[in-house]
């Protein structure tokens, strides 16, 4: 049994073998990536634990509204090549959730650092704006640029993983990746006991964490509400 972490790794493994069982962890779109036939019935030699959770978009908006009550528009920045599920899964949910929160949804699909800068500059020029950064290899690769632009333009931004916040991002809400790794051995054991990956459903995330960088909040002039402080899993001073 092979454990594969991230979409690029699993894609490479998938090219090498269609027989050795593979259990993936932290893959955004296993169906779109061609790793499994469906979430319920993977159908091949690959199964595992995805980070996709469409309902998280509503939580993002809730957190941003708590942080910025005068919120009027929110942009989502993502790259469709590194997260095919973005357009298919996250964006429709984002647009619907925006209606509930009565904010204008803006979808920014980016493919280069220049496009990141342009999209964020346009957003920063609009009052009452905030930004959601979707997961994906592209946004991870360019996280330093995104974080620095958010700080320069004073855009309240929520990120998908803690490491964005460890590197200076304002706050993150996302899948607890360590929890996925803790759950993976169960599938490995079941496969070693004779179960087939084809019959083991792809598992969704169960545990999420909110991390807030208080130093960044002070630098940007944001007062973090007590309700967010109380609900945070970690506070970075």
Where are these predicted regions, by residue range?
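Short hydrophobic alpha-helices and adjacent helix-cap/hinge residues
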Residues: 1-237
């Amino acid at each position: 049994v092979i454990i594969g972490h991230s979409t690029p790794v699993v894609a490479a493994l998938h090219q090498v073998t269609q027989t050795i069982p593979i259990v993936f962890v932290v893959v955004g779109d296993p169906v779109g990536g061609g790793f499994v036939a469906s979430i319920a019935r993977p159908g091949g030699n690959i199964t595992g634990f995805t980070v996709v959770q469409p309902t998280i978009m509503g939580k993002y908006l809730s957190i941003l509204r708590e942080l910025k009550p005068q919120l009027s528009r929110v942009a989502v920045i993502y790259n469709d090549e590194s997260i095919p599920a973005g357009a298919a899964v996250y964006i429709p949910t984002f647009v619907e959730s925006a209606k509930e929160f009565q904010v204008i949804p803006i979808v920014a699909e980016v493919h280069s650092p220049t496009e990141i800068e342009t999209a964020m500059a346009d957003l920063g020029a609009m009052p009452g704006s905030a930004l959601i950064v979707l997961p994906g290899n592209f946004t991870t690769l360019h996280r330093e640029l995104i974080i620095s632009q958010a700080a320069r333009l004073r855009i309240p931004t929520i990120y998908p993983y803690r490491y964005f916040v460890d590197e200076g991002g304002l706050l993150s809400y996302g899948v607890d990746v360590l929890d996925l790794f803790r759950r993976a051995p169960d599938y490995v054991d079941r496969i070693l006991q004779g179960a087939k990956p084809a019959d083991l459903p792809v598992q969704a995330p169960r545990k999420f964490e909110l991390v807030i960088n208080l130093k960044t909040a002070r630098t940007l002039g944001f007062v973090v509400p007590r309700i967010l402080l109380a609900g945070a899993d970690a506070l970075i001073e």
